[in-house]
Amino acid sequence: LVSESNPGRAIPAGGKGATIRAARPGLATTLNGPKAGNGTTGATKLTTPARPLSEGANMMCDHRAGGNAAISGSSVGEGTARAGDSKVMSRMLSPKGSIIAGTVNMMPADIAAGSVRTPSSLPPDGRSATPMSVSEVASDISHKDGSVNVTKDPVTAAGLTAMRKNANKGSPPASPLPLKADNKGVHINKHWVDLKNDNDFNTR
């Protein structure tokens, strides 16, 4: 992982308000934001060199003070950003220019060829400045390999648990609720969401 402002140089621990553990694809890379209450924003920008999807997707992450987000690259190029109990919001920006806000789990084949850039522009309360509907998210993910998780609740552990239980009518699964997106709509488990009628699934 390298600093966008200083290409080719690894970001040291504590750089730009984040502690970074670089890892090869398949291992987790963890970012810890500045301590809560210090009034600063953890705006560490990360990018990896362009690699095939099998070696991990390229992405960057902005996160708020007091929060943390984990990004892991698996052997199939999956990138996961997951918020904890603090109301941290991870934001990812695809090459197409649309912001994906919320808890996102993506396998973006169309992103593998280049870096994903994210602006450092979260409002003071940590909410997303630009909410996205499921249709907007779906249209931004490869319809062949795209997989994205979106929660309509504020990004908290309780909100995610409630959504998983509601969607699965039982205990929450080990991983976030899967949404399969293609160029016609979004599959939520076995349920279909029409891209033109998805207001109940907007991210916040």
Curated annotation (Swiss-Prot):
Most active from pH 5.0 to 8.0. Its EC number is 4.2.2.25. Optimum temperature is 70 degrees Celsius. Active from 50 to 80 degrees Celsius, at 55 degrees Celsius it has 50% of its full activity. Thermostable, retains full activity after heating at 60 degrees Celsius for 24 hours. In the absence of substrate, its half life at 70 degrees Celsius is 50 minutes. In the presence of substrate full activity is retained after incubation at 70 degrees Celsius for 2.5 hours. It is found in: Secreted. Keywords: Lyase, Secreted. One of its GO terms (cellular component) is extracellular region. It is an enzyme of class 4 (lyase). GO terms for molecular function: gellan lyase activity. Signal peptide: none annotated. Induction: By gellan. Activity is stimulated by zinc, potassium, lithium, cobalt, sodium, calcium, iron, manganase, magnesium and mercury ions at a concentration of 1 mM, but inhibited by copper ions at a concentration of 1 mM. Activity is inhibited by potassium, sodium and magnesium ions at a concentration of 1 M. Activity is inhibited by urea, EDTA, dithiothreitol, p-CMB, PSF, natrium lauryl sulfate and N-bromosuccinimide. It catalyses: Eliminative cleavage of beta-D-glucopyranosyl-(1->4)-beta-D-glucopyranosyluronate bonds of gellan backbone releasing tetrasaccharides containing a 4-deoxy-4,5-unsaturated D-glucopyranosyluronic acid at the non-reducing end. The tetrasaccharide produced from deacetylated gellan is beta-D-4-deoxy-Delta(4)-GlcAp-(1->4)-beta-D-Glcp-(1->4)-alpha-L-Rhap-(1->3)-beta-D-Glcp. Multimer. Cleaves the glycosidic bonds of gellan backbone and releases tetrasaccharide units of glucuronyl-glucosyl-rhamnosyl-glucose with unsaturated glucuronic acid at the non-reducing terminal. The enzyme is highly specific to the heteropolysaccharide gellan. This is Gellan lyase. It comes from Geobacillus stearothermophilus (Bacillus stearothermophilus).
